[in-house]
Amino acid sequence: MLYETKTSHNCETVMEKAKDFFNGEWGLEVSSKEDCCALFQGGGGHVFIQCIKDEDKLKVELATREWDRQVKKFMRKV
């Protein structure tokens, strides 16, 4: 499933929050991480998160399999 939200945070902050949330709280492994994106895997699924500049805010795209509830919770945090 693909999700999208906008935030006033910068990409670095979003990636830190994503690592704390998906790796720290839920135990997903960080499979890859760049400045603008990260892939977390575990529990039979994955979460891919990407930051995209969009006018005055930052667009955050999240693609997931098996972690929809957690992705929705994360979107409320950013």
Spans of features found by a protein language model:
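Terminal, regulation- and interaction-focused segments at domain boundaries
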Residues: 1-30
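Positively charged, low-complexity terminal tracts
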Residues: 3, 29-33, 42-43, 65-66
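Generic recognition of cysteine residues
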Residues: 11, 36-37, 51
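Short, solvent-exposed secondary-structure boundary motifs
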Residues: 19-21, 36-44
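Ser/Thr- and Asn-enriched, surface-exposed coil loops between beta-strands
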Residues: 31-37, 56
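Beta-strand/loop substructures that line and gate deep hydrophobic ligand-binding cavities in soluble
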Residues: 41-78
